[in-house]
């Protein structure tokens, strides 16, 4: 498993397991909405009224509609936490925080 996948996989898996609705922004500006049905190293299957296979290289941002609880493996070199002695670290990703960041970026453009 690559280092990049060690962050993507838990995030996408949490979205899939919790059946969280997501907005997927593509690099060309198109917004797709649905639920993550499945994913692999190269693509994500997004379910709405139909299933769409979206290649990861075309995705800019994935925004969950609600908070997602993520479990990081302790070997993940990219995740730093004050509780490094624990076997796993848990973070909440809040879509409202991501929206604020997105709005600030739009204002700065």
From Swiss-Prot:
Function: RNA chaperone that binds small regulatory RNA (sRNAs) and mRNAs to facilitate mRNA translational regulation in response to envelope stress, environmental stress and changes in metabolite concentrations. Also binds with high specificity to tRNAs.
Protein name from the UniProt record: RNA-binding protein Hfq
GO biological process terms, semicolon-separated: regulation of DNA-templated transcription; regulation of RNA stability; regulation of translation, ncRNA-mediated
GO cellular component terms, A-Z: cytosol
Keyword terms, alphabetized: RNA-binding, Stress response
Family label: Belongs to the Hfq family.
NCBIfam families: Hfq, PRK00395.1
A Pfam family this chain is assigned to: Hfq
Sm domain ranges (all copies): 9-68
GO MF entry, a single one: RNA binding
HAMAP family, A to Z: Hfq (MF_00436)
Organism from which the protein derives: Francisella philomiragia subsp. philomiragia (strain ATCC 25017 / CCUG 19701 / FSC 153 / O#319-036)
Quaternary data: Homohexamer.
